[in-house]
Amino acid sequence: MSVLTPLLLRGLTGSARRLPVPRAKIHSLPPEGKLGIMELAVGLTSCFVTFLLPAGWILSHLETYRRPE
């Protein structure tokens, strides 16, 4: 690295340091009521079907995805 590299990098990042960083204003309240058993069951089942079922299908059919040698 040359002697001018730190000066060049400082010149490139100097303008970025002065930019204001936007902050998210997130405010939430506690839930009005507790979740019931049926709501929990529906939520967990939908997560299982959405994420784990396709991954399990791919893993069970992994040999068909391999390239023939």
Swiss-Prot record:
Sequence intervals crossing the membrane: 37-60
A GO BP entry: generation of precursor metabolites and energy
Tissues/organs with expression: Widely expressed.
Mitochondrial intermembrane topological domain residue ranges: 61-69
GO cellular component term of the entry, any: mitochondrial membrane
Targeting signal (transit peptide) range: 1-25
GO molecular function, a single term: cytochrome-c oxidase activity
Topology Mitochondrial matrix: residue spans: 26-36
Keywords for the protein's UniProt record, in alphabetical order: Membrane, Mitochondrion, Mitochondrion inner membrane, Primary mitochondrial disease, Transit peptide, Transmembrane, Transmembrane helix, Ubl conjugation
Principal place of residence: mitochondrion
Tagged with keyword ATP-binding: no
Pfam families associated with the record: COX8
Cellular localization per UniProt: Mitochondrion inner membrane
Short motif (SIFI-degron): ranges: 2-19
Pathway annotation from the record: Energy metabolism; oxidative phosphorylation
Post-translational modification: In response to mitochondrial stress, the precursor protein is ubiquitinated by the SIFI complex in the cytoplasm before mitochondrial import, leading to its degradation. Within the SIFI complex, UBR4 initiates ubiquitin chain that are further elongated or branched by KCMF1.
Annotated family: Belongs to the cytochrome c oxidase VIII family.
Disease: Mitochondrial complex IV deficiency, nuclear type 15: An autosomal recessive mitochondrial disorder with onset in infancy. MC4DN15 is characterized by global developmental delay, poor feeding, metabolic acidosis, short stature, microcephaly, proximal muscle weakness, and distal spasticity. Additional manifestations include scoliosis, primary pulmonary hypertension, refractory seizures, and inability to walk. Serum and CSF lactate levels are increased. Patient tissues show decreased levels and activity of mitochondrial respiratory complex IV.
Subunit structure: Component of the cytochrome c oxidase (complex IV, CIV), a multisubunit enzyme composed of 14 subunits. The complex is composed of a catalytic core of 3 subunits MT-CO1, MT-CO2 and MT-CO3, encoded in the mitochondrial DNA, and 11 supernumerary subunits COX4I1 (or COX4I2), COX5A, COX5B, COX6A1 (or COX6A2), COX6B1 (or COX6B2), COX6C, COX7A2 (or COX7A1), COX7B, COX7C, COX8A and NDUFA4, which are encoded in the nuclear genome.
Protein name: Cytochrome c oxidase subunit 8A, mitochondrial
